[in-house]
Amino acid sequence: MTLFIDGCVREQSRTRELAQAVLDTLGTSVQTVSVNSDWPAPLSRESLALRDELLHRGDLDHPLLRFARQFAAADEIVMAAPYWDLLFPAAVRAYFEAVTVSGITFRYDEHGIPHGLCRAKHFTFVTTAGGPIIGNFGFAYAEALCRGFYGIETVRCISAEGLDIVGADVPAILAEAKKGIVSAGK
């Protein structure tokens, strides 16, 4: 099963369009988590205390942990997150908070080193930007979590930038990015 994390707020999202091109190459069943419907709230004092209590009791089946369980069980993960303010929408950060759960998506060894517990071996981060992508901090953050915590071996970024620059040939830019999807492969 491929998990599609749709962090695109806009109905007509170019990031989602590019992500769909990635999904079309995979040929697997897809479960979608969308920022516009089923999405975790940012951690609060209360939800963090509940999560800590659940983990202390070993109650990993609680609904609060469903996003982490789903993420850990996925065979492949595709995330669509537009490039906003040098990162991605705040809701995407809330999603990462919900899935970064010790005992479900990673564990610490006796030296405090995290080790991944996720089934997925591939994570594809898809992003688009109206201007140039400077630093790609959103991808860097996702990549650090995937490699450093979740144990996901292959992490790649598919992007299209300059889409809102006056005179930009948006269809051509997106078509070029889509060509890169096939050549990048898994």
Question: Where do the PLM segments sit?
Answer:
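Short, glycine-/small-residue-rich phosphate/pyrophosphate-handling segment
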Residues: D109-Y150
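Short histidine/acidic/glycine/proline-rich micro-motifs that form metal-
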Residues: V9-Q12, G130-I133, L163-I165
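Glycine-rich phosphate/pyrophosphate-binding loop and the adjoining helix
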Residues: A140-K186
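Structured loop/turn residues at beta-strand edges in well-structured enzyme cores
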Residues: A72, A90, C118, Y150-E153
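Cofactor-binding loop segments of dinucleotide-utilizing enzymes, especially the Rossmann-like FAD-
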Residues: G7, V35, T127-T128, A160
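Short, well-ordered alpha-helical segments in soluble proteins
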Residues: F96-V99, G103, T127, Y150
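N-terminal beta1-alpha1-beta2 submodule of the flavodoxin-like/Rossmannoid cofactor-binding fold
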Residues: M1-V101, K179-K186
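Conserved nucleotide-sugar donor-interacting segment of glycosyltransferase catalytic cores
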Residues: V101-H111
